[in-house]
Amino acid sequence: MVLVVAGFDPSGGAGIIQDVKVLSALGVKTHAVISALTVQNENRVFSVNFRDWEEMRKEIEVLTPPRVIKVGLSAPETVKRLREMFPDSAIVWNVVLESSSGFGFQDPEEVKKFVEYADYVILNSEEAKKLGEYNNFIVTGGHEKGNTVKVKYRDFVFEIPRVPGEFHGTGCAFSSAVSGFLAMSYPVEEAIRSAMELLKKILERSSGVVETEKLLRDWYRYDTLNTLDEILPEFLEIGHLTVPEVGQNVSYALPWAKNEFEVGKFPGRIRLKEGKAVAVSCASFKDRSHTARMAVTMMRYHPHMRCVVNVRYEREYVERAKKRGLKVFHYDRSKEPKEVQEKEGQSMVWMIEQAIAELKSPPDVIYDEGWWGKEAMIRVFGRNPKEVLEKIKLMVRE
């Protein structure tokens, strides 16, 4: 477990918010106590107010003793107080002498008095020049020029490719990552190396500020595909009743999807082979798909409706859907404007827009009875594949 004692940055790019984001991304249990209140945004610090130790102590002493303590913007004597409270905990102190905009937080001479109480002191190369050389310093070179970033600890020099750009909150993110890996029993050298690799991944996804939360998008991508692969056998089980001649797809969009390549689906579709449904491939974000484009279009109006499946048209399916309370829209392809018919993929967009305009709410089912060169089709919409599957079962089972 890691105890974070750090300042509050209202912009969320640095400080205790960033610390908790990084540690959460690592799956490390975290307790947090605010040590300083700042007035700042991503570009400038206006003021800082350090909290009284006695107030902080009352909050800290009721918590579980931590394995690692990460100290951010705090009165320097806080490090000594924490060492007295937790003699067996590793303390990682991210020294912040001044902001990138030039706001002075701490006096270097005052900081020097308390360096010995931390196991590791993380600071940038400019700050290290002001404080001198200490055996427990981990010095970052992000402020220096070059195509790589170097981090120095004792006789070790770690190097990693630089991510272009200026980012608010890199010091907090890096020191929190080091703390997290130490809490997982990494040797300090490996904690530094792993923290550098993690920060690089975060910065590659960030713009202007350290956006650790975007790592969650990687989990969403995994979860979306995993959800599709797990539920596939259930779709195959009823596939003999649902798969149309053109094949079937289960398209499940990421929450922020803007195009079909941000929608999970089954490339090659689900097909019928000797009367039995089979999937050509496992779930992927690759390949193009009409149902994927339909999912993206639906989300423009109803962002929570992220899943759509095409189903073989049977008149009794439509009647059961209506009878069992699903919201059904009949799409008449003969009424499509010429410009819609002539533009590839535009029919799907226009279809959904017409359904929403008439129903005034998200449709469960949109069906059409076919047209020249177009197979009659039912499309079923829902929040996720499980919900769509249940709607399909309502339609196909007597």
UniProtKB/Swiss-Prot annotation:
Q: What's a single GO MF annotation on this record?
A: hydroxymethylpyrimidine kinase activity
Q: Where does 4-amino-5-hydroxymethyl-2-methylpyrimidine bind?
A: 40
- Entry's Gene Ontology cellular component terms: cytosol
What is this enzyme's class at the first EC digit?
Answer: transferase
Catalytic activity, per the record? 4-amino-5-hydroxymethyl-2-methylpyrimidine + ATP = 4-amino-2-methyl-5-(phosphooxymethyl)pyrimidine + ADP + H(+); 4-amino-2-methyl-5-(phosphooxymethyl)pyrimidine + ATP = 4-amino-2-methyl-5-(diphosphooxymethyl)pyrimidine + ADP; 2-[(2R,5Z)-2-carboxy-4-methylthiazol-5(2H)-ylidene]ethyl phosphate + 4-amino-2-methyl-5-(diphosphooxymethyl)pyrimidine + 2 H(+) = thiamine phosphate + CO2 + diphosphate; 2-(2-carboxy-4-methylthiazol-5-yl)ethyl phosphate + 4-amino-2-methyl-5-(diphosphooxymethyl)pyrimidine + 2 H(+) = thiamine phosphate + CO2 + diphosphate
Please indicate if the UniProt record lists Kinase as a keyword. Answer: yes
Q: Which UniProt keywords apply?
A: ATP-binding, Kinase, Multifunctional enzyme, Nucleotide-binding, Thiamine biosynthesis, Transferase
Q: Where is this region: Thiamine-phosphate synthase?
A: 217-398
Instruction: State the EC number(s).
Output: 2.7.1.49, 2.7.4.7, 2.5.1.3
**Some GO term, biological process aspect, for this entry: which one?**
thiamine diphosphate biosynthetic process
Please give the function described in this protein's UniProt entry: Catalyzes the phosphorylation of hydroxymethylpyrimidine phosphate (HMP-P) to HMP-PP, and of HMP to HMP-P. Condenses 4-methyl-5-(beta-hydroxyethyl)thiazole monophosphate (THZ-P) and 4-amino-5-hydroxymethyl pyrimidine pyrophosphate (HMP-PP) to form thiamine monophosphate (TMP).
Q: What is this protein called?
A: Bifunctional thiamine biosynthesis protein ThiDN
